Amino acid sequence: MLFGVGLGGFFDGIVLHQILQWHHMLSSWYPINSMENLELNTFWDGVFHSATYIFVLSALFILWRSARLSHFKWSTREFAGTMLIGFGMFNLVEGVVDHQVLGLHHVNETVERSSWMFWDIGFLIWGAAMVALGWVAGRRS
């Protein structure tokens, strides 16, 4: 699951923060309307990316250690399933904590403010669907 959490964070940070530029880490608190706010948000985007990198490195370390055990069983379905669960869990936790509880940012801040909630709900549905799909894939292995 750690791989999925890390990859979910990378997807969010790279695609939503950098490529599409829909939001930044603190863009609801500090809107991107000045160079100072952009620098602050970019810094916290980097902190966020560093955290996701730690998840991926931790997953790689655990996988490496486990793979060296003689009783370790390789299963593509289980691996893909746990990655989907982790990715989906990232979306659910980030969607609830960052978007709703703390209000740090919302999924798509480039649309009218009245539409932000729809994007946030879609993000949560996407996360729940990945968890469910991952669970089904993992059970069949």
Residue ranges, per PLM feature:
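Hydrophobic alpha-helical transmembrane segments of integral membrane proteins
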Residues: 1, 52, 74, 79-81, ...
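Alpha-helical transmembrane segments of multi-pass membrane proteins
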Residues: 5-9, 86-94
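Interfacial helix-loop-helix junctions of multi-pass membrane proteins
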Residues: 16-26, 95-116
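Membrane-interface loop-to-helix entry segments
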Residues: 38-61, 114-133
